[in-house]
Amino acid sequence: MAKRKQNVRSKRKVKKNIESGIVHIRSTFNNTIVTITDMQGNAISWATAGNMGFKGSRKSTPFAAQLASETAAKTAMDNGMRTVEVNVKGPGAGREAAIRALQAIGLEVTAIRDVTPVPHNGCRPPKRRRV
């Protein structure tokens, strides 16, 4: 009989010691997504308003964005992160609340960039909603 090969995979996440990183905040009209990466762009932690338990129109509130930002920041701080740059994208309500939550939890924000994509008259937008 042939021996079975056992693949041993660790279930625990490896803690990295990363001093500084980038916080990407994508704030849409329906949700807020917070991703924290190292300087090369490798994701360390992430959180969304929907992931925090909010559903429907409550996902788009500033409070939901604040909770998502705090959760992602706590995980990043466990990995040794102290200073961050913030890239904000989108027109949503949770933009400022997410940045304030990062500062309140103890991360030092060195730069805030608005990287919202603006078309130079590219694609035709969808037709207007009539309710």
Curated annotation (Swiss-Prot):
Pfam families the record matches: Ribosomal_S11 (PF00411)
GO annotation (BP), single: translation
Keywords: Ribonucleoprotein, Ribosomal protein, RNA-binding, rRNA-binding
Gene Ontology MF: a single term: rRNA binding
GO CC aspect terms: ribonucleoprotein complex; ribosome
SUPFAM superfamilies with a match to the protein in the record: Translational machinery components
Family that this chain belongs to: Belongs to the universal ribosomal protein uS11 family.
General function of this protein: Located on the platform of the 30S subunit, it bridges several disparate RNA helices of the 16S rRNA. Forms part of the Shine-Dalgarno cleft in the 70S ribosome.
HAMAP family the record matches: Ribosomal_uS11 (MF_01310)
Subunit structure: Part of the 30S ribosomal subunit. Interacts with proteins S7 and S18. Binds to IF-3.
Name of the featured protein: Small ribosomal subunit protein uS11
Originating species: Exiguobacterium sibiricum (strain DSM 17290 / CCUG 55495 / CIP 109462 / JCM 13490 / 255-15)
